[in-house]
Design a protein with these regions (language model features):
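Acidic, metal-coordinating catalytic segment for phosphate/diphosphate chemistry
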Residues: 2-37, 41-43
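A residue-level structural signature of the nucleotidyltransferase/glycosyltransferase Rossmann-like core
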Residues: 7, 46-47, 140-141
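Detector for glycine-centered tight turns/loop "hinges" at secondary-structure junctions
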Residues: 12-15, 45, 90, 112
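Residue-level structural signal for beta-strand termini and adjacent loop
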Residues: 20-22, 53, 77, 136
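Nudix hydrolase/Nudix homology domain
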Residues: 24, 61, 73, 102-181
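A glycine-rich, hydrophobic loop/mini-helix early in the fold
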Residues: 35-67
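A structural signal for short, well-ordered beta-strand segments
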Residues: 38, 66-67, 98, 120-122
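The catalytic Nudix box helix
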Residues: 48-49, 66-100
Length: 181
């Protein structure tokens, strides 16, 4: 079994308690597990937004942050973030920084699948061109951070539930990364 096929289970305090196979974890009664969200910026200060592939099990076709994922058992979070950036976007990244260390959410998608995650949020810089994996990303766009904030403020239901919650909490960080202070 590959590292990326496992999800780390955690208790209410965020302590690792074990792992489960990723293919069995997301259901109507998803246990609390560890994940991450990352907002990727280019050299012009734009943030990458992606539309999830239509074949994704959860929230297919929904616009969201740059990428998300789960660390494997024993895998450092920054290694998991770098691994997912390469897998989903075909890009190397740098300057990874945690901006919302205690973010947690629960959400249910249209099919009844529940996300139940302790999901620290990171920002990073792209170190190359995006070559999106079509099994992960249907579309993508580099946009100004101010446009992302305005879109989420105006119509939060049109983005993933985690992005709708994260963007208002990290407004200052998004603007700073985008060169707007």
């Amino acid at each position: 079994m590959l590292l990326e096929d496992r999800v780390v289970l955690v208790d209410e305090g965020g302590e690792r308690t074990g792992w489960a196979e990723k293919s069995t974890i997301h259901s109507a009664s998803t246990p609390l597990h560890l994940a991450f969200s990352c907002y990727l910026f280019d050299e012009a200060g734009r943030v990458l937004v992606t539309r999830r592939a239509l074949t994704k099990r959860t929230w297919p076709g929904v616009w969201t942050n740059s990428f998300c994922g789960h660390p494997g058992p024993g895998e450092p979070m920054t290694s998991a973030i770098e691994r997912h950036a390469r897998h989903e976007l075909g890009v190397d990244i740098g300057d990874i920084r945690e901006v919302l260390p205690d973010f947690r959410y629960t959400a249910t998608d249209a099919s009844g699948i529940v996300e139940n995650e302790i999901c620290p949020v990171y920002v990073a810089r792209s170190r190359g061109l995006i070559v999106a994996n079509p099994n992960e990303v249907a579309e993508w766009a580099w946009i100004d951070a101010t446009d992302l904030i305005a879109a989420v403020d105006a119509t939060p239901r049109l983005v993933s539930p985690w992005s709708a919650l994260q963007v208002p909490l990290m407004r200052a960080e998004l603007l700073a990364m985008g060169g707007v202070a």
